[in-house]
UniProtKB/Swiss-Prot annotation:
Catalyzes the hydrolysis of N-succinyl-L,L-diaminopimelic acid (SDAP), forming succinate and LL-2,6-diaminopimelate (DAP), an intermediate involved in the bacterial biosynthesis of lysine and meso-diaminopimelic acid, an essential component of bacterial cell walls. Its EC number is 3.5.1.18. It comes from Aliivibrio fischeri (strain ATCC 700601 / ES114). This is Succinyl-diaminopimelate desuccinylase. Pathway: Amino-acid biosynthesis; L-lysine biosynthesis via DAP pathway; LL-2,6-diaminopimelate from (S)-tetrahydrodipicolinate (succinylase route): step 3/3. Zn(2+) 2 binds at D101, E136, H350. PANTHER family: ACETYLORNITHINE DEACETYLASE, N-ACETYL-L-CITRULLINE DEACETYLASE. Belongs to the peptidase M20A family. DapE subfamily. The active site is at D70, E135 (proton acceptor).
Length: 377
């Protein structure tokens, strides 16, 4: 039996070694099929990253499918049961790097649009694709640059589905209608280097920092809300000392991270951190990196369309969650867009033997098409 259109495109995409930020020709495959549907294609290359913006129609509302063609490295190939770039079906599961994150979703999007346009060639509004090869990497020259370009010419996305793997047990059981923000602090606490036998003429920055770090770790930053858990504070990295047992270090470097809800702002978190550090009389330098702001789509046409589409296909409404890490949805949401993440099961993403259920890909295609029916038919 021949492959379905979704499975055929998924296999073509998965056979290309598009390890971030490489695209390896994946976008060409998508563009070819979209051009045949009357999409106008705009390729945007920023340094080592390839992106494209495709649009069909010039009316509102503007609905966008967003995703990425890059994948994470495979890891040790000896731990894979199959070649990660030779898509293989075993017991109904499609194995390949990127099967779930997120080339499977990309195939579903394209085929869903093909079917929808065939049935509704004069559909309402406009359909677009925002695709990047820089989601798994530093995310500097990908979606965020395309969004900047669109905003500069006042081309604003109204509604967007990001194809990130949102599901847990079966496709569509969970959709993400928001994400927490991420704020990283790089803190250097300064002391005076010296001999451990003479602490009175040195100043140990590790000892000095510990009470402040303890307070930061136990502070309740907010209580969250109906959609988000309370803001969390974690220290993932800490480095100080020369490696010798008889030297008091002159500095200690601490990296900390907030995953924050819509109940807190960047300014509020930064101000409270500085207040705590100053209260403990530390000599320090502190630099901040805003990795992403929180977003939430708690109402609106898109949320209704997605929930109803999943219910139509699965005969069960999805659970709405905001858990997990960040995604490119955070950049699109800053346009004021309604953003929802709907994609395959995420159990094997970034792991060896990454896989996706073949039947789930067909269901996801149906869901995406039903969303278009609900919004633009």
């Amino acid at each position: 039996m021949s492959d379905t259109p979704t499975l055929a495109l998924a296999k073509d995409l998965l056979s290309r070694q598009s390890i971030t930020p490489e695209d390896a020709g994946c976008q060409e495959l998508m563009i070819k099929q979209l051009e045949a549907l009357g999409f106008t294609i705009e390729i945007m290359v920023f340094e080592d990253t390839t992106n494209f913006w495709a649009r069909r129609g010039n009316k509102a509302p503007l609905f966008t499918f967003a995703g990425h063609t890059d994948v994470v490295p495979t890891g040790d190939l000896t731990h894979w049961n199959t070649n990660p770039f030779e898509p293989t079906i075993i017991d109904g599961m499609l194995y390949a790097r990127g099967a779930a994150d997120m080339k499977g979703s990309l195939a579903c999007m394209v085929v869903a649009v093909e079917r929808f346009v065939a049935e509704h060639p004069n559909h309402k509004g406009s359909i677009s694709f925002l695709i990047t090869s820089d989601e798994e990497g530093p995310f500097i020259n990908g979606t965020t640059r395309v969004v900047d370009t669109l905003q500069e010419r006042n081309e604003i996305i109204d509604m967007c589905i990001v194809g990130e793997p949102s599901s847990t047990a079966h496709v569509g059981d969970v959709v993400k209608n928001g994400r927490r923000g991420s704020l990283t602090g790089n803190l250097t606490v300064k002391g005076i280097q010296g001999h451990v036998a003479y602490p009175h003429i040195a100043r140990n920055p590790i000892h000095q920092a510990m009470p402040a770090l303890s307070e930061l770790a136990t502070t309740v930053w907010d209580n969250g809300n109906d959609y988000f858990p309370p803001t969390s504070f974690q220290i993932p990295n800490m480095n100080g000392g020369t490696g010798a047992s008889n030297v008091i270090p002159g500095t200690v470097d601490i990296m900390f991270n907030f995953r924050f809800s819509t109940e807190s702002t960047v300014d509020e978190l930064q101000q409270r951190v500085v207040e705590i550090l100053d209260k403990h009389d530390l000599e320090y330098e502190l630099d901040w990196i805003i990795n992403g702001l929180p977003f939430l789509t708690d109402t609106g046409d898109l949320l209704t369309a997605v929930v109803n589409a999943v219910d139509t296909v699965n005969q069960q409404k999805p659970q709405l969650l905001t858990t997990g890490g960040t995604s490119d949805g955070r950049f699109i949401a800053q346009m004021g867009s309604q953003v929802i993440e709907l994609g395959p099961v995420n159990a094997t993403i970034h792991k060896v033997n990454e896989c996706v259920n073949v039947e789930d890909l067909e269901k996801l295609t149906d869901m995406y098409q039903e969303v278009l029916n609900n919004l633009l038919a």
